[in-house]
Amino acid sequence: AAKLMMETGFDAVEIHFSHGYGLSQFISPKTNRRTDAYGGSLENRMRLPLRALEAVRRAVGDDFPILGKIGLTDGVRGGLRIEEAIEVAAMLDRAGIDALICSGGTSSFNPMVYFRGETLDKGLVEVETNPIAKLGLKLIGPKMFRYYPYEELYFLEGARRVRDRVNCQMVYIGGCTDLESVEQVMQEGFDFIQLGRPLIKDPAFVNNARANPDYKNGCIHCNRCATLIEAPGGVYCPLNEEERAS
C-alpha cells in the first residue's frame, strides 16, 4: 500500500500507531494481553509496530518520508500513558521514522480525547438509519463519548515532551485553529502542523490566513462534521451549509 501511494504521486505516507487501530492494539497494555514475544514489556509490544515500519521503509526506500501518528495517552484505565508514549516515540525515532505526530485517545474506548468540544453521540444518533444501532448509541453514547472542553493546543504539553526526546521532525496536531496558535507552534520548533476540522470548515485555510492577518477560521468545535462520517453525503461542515442558506 505504501509503495502504491509513492508510485501514485503522494509526498509521504503516515503509519497509524494510535487511536486503537491494529498497531495501537499491540502497543497498548489495555488491549495487548499476549503472553508470547509480542506481549508484556513495551519492547515486546513494540515488536510488530517496528516490523511494520521496517517493512514500509523497505518498500518505499530511504528517500520517501514516513510519518507516524502515536498516542500520548489512550485515555482509559490500564491504557498507554505519556511516559510509555515517549518511549514509543524514541523507539520509532531510532528505527528511522522521518516525523512523528502526537495525538491521543482511542476510537473504541474514549475518542473525545482527540476530538474535544461537543460530544458526538447526539449527532451520531441523528444520522444513524439502523434502528438497533440508533438504540445502542442512545444507551451507550453518553458513557462512551465523555465531554472534554475544547481549548487551543490541547496536545502541546505532551508533544513538547516527545519533541525533546527525539531527533526526527515533529508534526503538531490538536487544537490549532487560531493564527496565534499556528505561530506559537512554529516558534516552539515544530516542523509542520496537521489540520483536520479547520480544513473541513475552510479548505482554503492556509491561503486565506496568508492573505489576511486578521483571518478567523470559524470552526466552533461542534464536531457535527465528525458525526457525518457514515452519512451518505460524506463529511462536510454543517455550519457552511447553514451560512449559505441564511
Q: Which positions does each model-derived feature cover?
A:
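Flavin-dependent oxidoreductase catalytic cores
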Residues: 1-246
